[in-house]
Amino acid sequence: MGNNERRTSRPAPGKVFLTHFGAAGWSITDGDKVFLLDPYLSRIRFQGRKYGPTDATEVPDDPRPIVKFNEGPAVNREVVDRHVPKADYIMLSHSHFNHCMDAPYIAKKTGAVIVGTESTMNIALNGGVPEEQTLAVKGGEDYAFDTFSLRVIPSLHSALSCKLYRDFGTVPRKDEPLTLDEYVEGGTLAYLLRVAGHEILLFGSMNFIEREIEGL
């Protein structure tokens, strides 16, 4: 290397560990910060046909109580505590219960910041999360933090029930517990997490907007 030449190579990426919770749920850590995507661990047993032409699959000898769509679900704290001892940021792709119903409990327990749409913020506030632990986004934001950055990407849910989609709207702000029916989609987001020299593209649903992810 000549005297006038400079090294331009980037530092080697650090280690990042990913844990899959099942469904859309992930835990990502660089050994310092812990990031969660759609951490739904309670796995409630629901009854109804909101998301398809048939009831939820029956499991023999399932001890979980059945929750109907006009009833409020309960967080399985034992399971959540076992799998989520720490969290710093919780990114929620959309506001269906099977993506975000555990998030308020996790945020209150760990002090994590919840990132998501207006509907997601209402779920957090309904669940007793302090407003300073919420970050409302619409898609298009790109935040630089101390050791990582987060780009929020407008996205789409997937069509349900014979390609028809009937779940638009906003989750209400209310004092009493939400029913399953009230966990509407509320808009869908994807996230690009940049941490420890890595870029991780996170989707919580099965659709996307092609132009929004071009060049990533």
Name the predicted role of every residue range.
Residues 22-26, 41-42:
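Short polar catalytic/cofactor-binding loops
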